[in-house]
Amino acid sequence: MSHETGRLIVEMVRAGRRPSDIMTRNSFLNAIIAVAAVGGSTNSVVHLLAIAGRLGVDLALADFDQAGRDVPLMVNLQPSGEFLMDDLYRAGGVLAALSQVKDLFHREAITVTGRPFVEYLLDRPVYDDAVILPRESPVMANAGIAVLSGNLAPNGAIIKPAAATTALLQHVGPAVVFDSIEDMRARLDDPDLVVTVNSVLVLRGCGPRGYPGMPEVGNMPLPRKLLEQGVRDMVRISDARMSGTAYGTVILHVAPEAAAGGPLAFVRTGDIICLDLKGRSLSFDVSDEELQRRETSAKSQAAYAAPTRGWAKLYVDHVMQADTGADLDFLVGASGDEVMRESH
């Protein structure tokens, strides 16, 4: 593989085939479709947005909802199904799974070889249709990562329906708010914590600036006393990320994050939160006037304690929000083909 990779790189240079020829808008849309078809990670959202930003490719959070909404989930893998990654490999692999939805991809998008991506989806046998399902009977008909918005997430938030509990995708419940990971760990299992199965767990201070670095803690654990009652999922909201192997009705990447002054910073325990997947809405029952009062009050209190020196300061001063890829703002935009000065 190393030899073949080196050979291909030389061939690309000789042919003048550049990354910008390969990573076009349609290629990014194909990536979104592929993620939906295999139940891929929510992390793909920030990764693809950041890469597109560095190439100067027009890609927005809304594209994930639009491109992935009608894509069926073709693989019966955990956390959305039964099997494991090794089972997918033995059943034919990712390309066999994507071949089931090959008609959905943009045909003009090419790969590093210069050939259209869809050519690699032809003649891909499936060896186990319990793992890679037929097109007519997918695990889920609409598996794409959903983009939510509302007064709790003006610039958007995301949820992975394929990993969620269907009954919780339309939900109204009171917030139980944690200001940080440390606050959550200190209070979550307190027997006196006022929380029920209908509560919505809210974790803030875990976004790109707030942590800093946007850790994978969005799929926060459930309170012990509810686990002992047999509860296995609850609606959870945060400005953090979560692992692609995690399960649950978890709303992530809330933008703007709390540390950037987003409405998530002003949610209080007891506020009623409404999740409406069908309507792509995430809101809390607080008037604009009350929200303004809370924001004004917060400004009069101690400000978010941002780092004051070193890489951490550079990072928080320049990191963008999750809805635009959480990249550093000075790295956005194509670099062009200028050859830099030799350093030797």
Where does each model-flagged region fall?
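Catalytic or ion-coupling anion/metal-binding cores of large enzyme and transporter domains
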Residues: 1-257, 262-344
